């Protein structure tokens, strides 16, 4: 698939991620969103060895934040900023926020940017959010019995299975492999091992999607600090080699088996100087295993329609042949609203700093992080991706 040219190319590889942090995840909590975001922000600044006074930019992605926004969050954090960004791309927004923070720094609008993502709600809060997600869903989906993302992705998975012969036992290898990594992650909501038999026999949710295809809505927050790499603690900066975003592709297609990644993947790998074989891990947006599979196809890890065979050939735990969502991903950690779009980014930085402890990918040098979001009437509207590389020791 040809790309749309150089549109979106990052201007510099001298800017990257110098710190990362995560709040405690919880299925139920009485904590406020502000406290969760603050916990993640403090952790990220500690990792960056920076104080609040060094920050002059802020980016935030959250469904639960309105009527507050990035500017009011800066006020609540006691920050004076020259650049503020409010993400609007759902699960693709956090990766896009880092891309735009790099552009802002390169343009001189900021020097150090705190990027945040998270939400504070349970299952009931998740459904309240979906009721007001966008006008298309409210006006056209809900009156016709559309009950949210499970129904749409059930259609997409069925379509993929019937079009290409993809099987549930192949898709299940994603959930099982990620759960194996989650058993070593103290912040994952689900840490018990998951067998393929348990995956296949779980209760039906939206045919053919079953229980372990779905994420658990939860509360939590993630943060990264974006800055010139010479601001990073010695040897612990993470380069952003390339990054792209795309919105509303394919135009007008209902339940598509592709997304915006296919339009920019050639430019992504060209800019990075590396392709899929050189990725030591992949942190893919995993609201459902079928979407991970589609991302692997669209990002060129296997030809379109052959992901079932690809999945059958690989193992996906942190020590597998293709380490995938090495903290367990949203399928095991939970989906903290918009934080689900940053959980993979934070894990990637952790891996590249070789700070992942027992789930460390051996010799991890570079990896890919993708985002996907704004699932409304017929398809997700937004796709994003970055390629990261470990800094010099």
Locate predicted features.
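Active-site-proximal alpha-helical scaffold in enzymes
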Residues: 89-119, 151-184, 224-230, 335-356
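Conserved catalytic cysteine-centered active-site region
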Residues: 9-11, 62-116, 120-152, 190-214, ...
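Short glycine/threonine-rich loop-to-helix capping motif typified by GTGT followed
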Residues: 65-74, 252-256, 286-309, 320, ...
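Conserved active-site "lid/cap" helical segment
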Residues: 2-92, 100, 160-170, 189-198, ...
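Acidic, glycine-rich active-site loops and adjacent beta-strand->loop/helix elements
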Residues: 22-24, 62-65, 90-93, 117-122, ...
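Condensing-enzyme catalytic core mediating Claisen C-C bond formation in acyl metabolism
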Residues: 2-34, 163, 173, 204-267, ...
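Extended C-terminal subregions enriched in glycine
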Residues: 266-289, 298-301, 330-336
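Beta-strand segments within the central parallel beta-sheet cores of soluble alpha/beta enzyme folds
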Residues: 52-61, 84-86, 113-118, 169-176, ...
């Amino acid at each position: 698939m040809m790309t749309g040219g150089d549109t979106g190319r990052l201007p510099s590889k001298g800017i990257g991620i110098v710190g990362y942090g995560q709040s405690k995840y919880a299925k139920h909590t009485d904590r406020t969103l502000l406290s969760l975001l603050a916990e993640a922000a403090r952790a990220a600044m500690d990792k960056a060895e920076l104080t609040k006074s060094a920050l002059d930019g802020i980016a935030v992605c959250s469904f639960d934040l309105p009527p507050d926004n990035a500017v009011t969050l800066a006020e609540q954090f006691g920050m004076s900023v020259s650049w503020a960004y409010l993400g609007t791309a759902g699960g693709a927004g956090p990766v896009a926020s880092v891309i735009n923070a790099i552009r802002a720094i390169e343009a001189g609008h900021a020097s150090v940017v705190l990027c945040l993502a998270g939400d504070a709600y349970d299952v009931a809060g998740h459904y309240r959010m979906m009721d007001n997600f966008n006008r298309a869903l409210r006006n056209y989906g809900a009156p016709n019995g559309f009950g949210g993302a499970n129904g749409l992705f059930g259609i997409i998975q069925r379509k993929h299975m019937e079009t290409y012969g993809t099987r549930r036992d192949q898709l299940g290898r994603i959930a099982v492999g990620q759960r194996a990594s989650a058993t070593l992650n103290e912040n994952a909501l689900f840490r018990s091992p998951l067998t393929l038999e348990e995956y296949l026999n779980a209760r039906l949710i939206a045919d053919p999607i079953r229980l372990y295809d779905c994420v658990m809505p939860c509360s939590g927050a993630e943060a990264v600090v974006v800055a010139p790499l010479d601001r990073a603690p010695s040897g612990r900066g993470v380069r952003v080699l390339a990054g792209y975003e795309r919105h509303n592709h394919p135009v007008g297609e209902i339940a598509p088996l592709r997304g915006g990644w296919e339009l920019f993947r050639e430019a992504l790998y060209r800019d990075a100087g590396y392709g899929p074989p050189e990725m030591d891990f992949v942190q893919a947006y995993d609201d459902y295993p079928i979407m991970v599979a589609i991302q692997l196809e669209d990002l060129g890890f296997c030809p379109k329609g052959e992901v079932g065979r690809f999945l059958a050939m690989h193992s996906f735990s942190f020590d597998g042949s293709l380490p995938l969502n090495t903290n367990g991903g949203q399928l095991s950690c939970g989906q903290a609203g918009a934080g689900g779009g940053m959980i993979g980014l934070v894990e990637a930085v952790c891996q590249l700093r070789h700070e992942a402890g027992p789930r460390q990918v051996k010799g991890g040098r570079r990896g890919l992080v993708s985002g996907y979001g704004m699932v409304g009437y017929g398809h997700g509207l937004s796709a994003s991706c970055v390629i990261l590389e470990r800094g010099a020791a």
